[in-house]
Amino acid sequence: MDPYELVTRNTVEVVTDEELRALIDRPVRRVYTGYEPSGEIHLGHMVTVNKLMDLQQAGFEVTVLIADLHAFLNRKGTMEEIRETAEYNRRCFEGLGLRGANYVLGSDVQLTPEYELAVLELSQAITLNRAKRSMDEVGRQMDNPTVSQMVYPIMQMVDIATLGVDAAVGGIDQRKIHMLAREHLPSIGYPAPVCIHTPIINGLDGKKMSSSAGNVISVADSEEDIKKKMKKAFCPPEVENNPVLEILRYHVFPRAGAVAIRRPEKFGGDREFAAYEDLERAYAAGEIHPLDLKNAAAAHLIDILAPVHDYVCSR
C-alpha cells in the first residue's frame, strides 16, 4: 500500500487532499493527535491510534500529546490524579503498537510565556459563540460554560503550532476546532495544518460510545469480558451503523489483514476474507450469521489486545 493510501484509508475526510499529497512528498513530515487522559482506553481511542500507526508506516514523525491541562480544565480531577492517568494512557498506547512516537505531556509545553501569549492572541480573534460551537461538536454541550472551557479549543489550536507539526489527526468531531486552527494560525505566524479526520464509531449497543454507558470494549478487558460484551453486541442484518462490522473494519482488518469466520461444516464451514468489503457483502447477503460475526470479532480483538495487557503489566 502506498503512503497516500495508508494515510487516507478508513478516514472520513482530509482537509485538504491537495495539501496532503504535497506533504507526503516532503522528506520530513510531522503529525500529531492529542488525547485527554482517560481512565479507560477503549476502541474509540484505538481508531486514531490505528491511524497514527498508518502515518508512521507512511514515513511521518508522530507526536502524541497527553493533554493533562486540558483534562484539568475539563474538571477530570486533580493534576496529580490526571498525570497518573496520563502515564497509564501512554503505556496503553505503546502496548497497542504506537511505539517510536514522541509522547509529550501537555503541561510540559503549555505553561511557557510564548504559549500563553499565542493563546491570548487567538482569544482576541475568536468569538465565544465559535469557541462554544467547537466544544459542542466534541460532545461537550454546555448551557453555562466556564471561561476555562472556552479556552480549551484555543489551547488545542496553539498545541498544533507549538509542537511544530504539519498535520493533525482527530475524530470527525474535532473538525470545527481544526477548521478554527486552519483559519487563525496563519494570523500569528504559523502554517495551517493538514487535517485528517477519522470516523466516530458506535458503542456495542449501536448508540454513542461512552465508558459510563458500559457500551465499550476497553484495552483492560479480559478475554471473558470481551466475549461476553461481543455476544450481547447489537448486530442487525444491515451493514449501516452495525458496531460489530465497524470493529472488524476499523480495528481488525488494519491490524490482522484478513478475517477468518470459524463455524461447523453443517453451517457452511470456515470462510476467509482478505478484504473488509468482501466480508461486508457476504454479511449483507445473509451468508454469515450475526453470532458467527460476533465470535470472529471477539477472537481477533482478544489477539489484538493481549499484547497491551502484557506490556502494561510488565512496566
Swiss-Prot record:
<comment type="similarity">
    <text>Belongs to the class-I aminoacyl-tRNA synthetase family. TyrS type 3 subfamily.</text>
</comment>
<feature type="binding site">
    <location>
        <position position="32"/>
    </location>
    <ligand>
        <name>L-tyrosine</name>
    </ligand>
</feature>
<feature type="binding site">
    <location>
        <position position="174"/>
    </location>
    <ligand>
        <name>L-tyrosine</name>
    </ligand>
</feature>
<comment type="function">
    <text>Catalyzes the attachment of tyrosine to tRNA(Tyr) in a two-step reaction: tyrosine is first activated by ATP to form Tyr-AMP and then transferred to the acceptor end of tRNA(Tyr).</text>
</comment>
<feature type="short sequence motif" description="'HIGH' region">
    <location>
        <begin position="37"/>
        <end position="45"/>
    </location>
</feature>
<keyword id="KW-0436">Ligase</keyword>
<dbReference type="InterPro" id="IPR001412">
    <property type="entry name" value="aa-tRNA-synth_I_CS"/>
</dbReference>
<feature type="short sequence motif" description="'KMSKS' region">
    <location>
        <begin position="208"/>
        <end position="212"/>
    </location>
</feature>
<dbReference type="GO" id="GO:0005737">
    <property type="term" value="C:cytoplasm"/>
</dbReference>
<dbReference type="InterPro" id="IPR023684">
    <property type="entry name" value="Tyr-tRNA-ligase_3"/>
</dbReference>
<feature type="binding site">
    <location>
        <position position="211"/>
    </location>
    <ligand>
        <name>ATP</name>
    </ligand>
</feature>
<dbReference type="InterPro" id="IPR002307">
    <property type="entry name" value="Tyr-tRNA-ligase"/>
</dbReference>
<dbReference type="GO" id="GO:0005524">
    <property type="term" value="F:ATP binding"/>
</dbReference>
<protein>
    <recommendedName>
        <fullName>Tyrosine--tRNA ligase</fullName>
        <ecNumber>6.1.1.1</ecNumber>
    </recommendedName>
</protein>
<keyword id="KW-0963">Cytoplasm</keyword>
<comment type="subunit">
    <text>Homodimer.</text>
</comment>
<keyword id="KW-0030">Aminoacyl-tRNA synthetase</keyword>
<dbReference type="Pfam" id="PF00579">
    <property type="entry name" value="tRNA-synt_1b"/>
</dbReference>
<dbReference type="GO" id="GO:0004831">
    <property type="term" value="F:tyrosine-tRNA ligase activity"/>
</dbReference>
<keyword id="KW-0547">Nucleotide-binding</keyword>
<dbReference type="InterPro" id="IPR050489">
    <property type="entry name" value="Tyr-tRNA_synthase"/>
</dbReference>
<dbReference type="InterPro" id="IPR014729">
    <property type="entry name" value="Rossmann-like_a/b/a_fold"/>
</dbReference>
<dbReference type="InterPro" id="IPR002305">
    <property type="entry name" value="aa-tRNA-synth_Ic"/>
</dbReference>
<feature type="binding site">
    <location>
        <position position="152"/>
    </location>
    <ligand>
        <name>L-tyrosine</name>
    </ligand>
</feature>
<feature type="binding site">
    <location>
        <position position="159"/>
    </location>
    <ligand>
        <name>L-tyrosine</name>
    </ligand>
</feature>
<keyword id="KW-0067">ATP-binding</keyword>
<dbReference type="GO" id="GO:0006437">
    <property type="term" value="P:tyrosyl-tRNA aminoacylation"/>
</dbReference>
<dbReference type="InterPro" id="IPR023617">
    <property type="entry name" value="Tyr-tRNA-ligase_arc/euk-type"/>
</dbReference>
<keyword id="KW-0648">Protein biosynthesis</keyword>
<feature type="binding site">
    <location>
        <position position="156"/>
    </location>
    <ligand>
        <name>L-tyrosine</name>
    </ligand>
</feature>
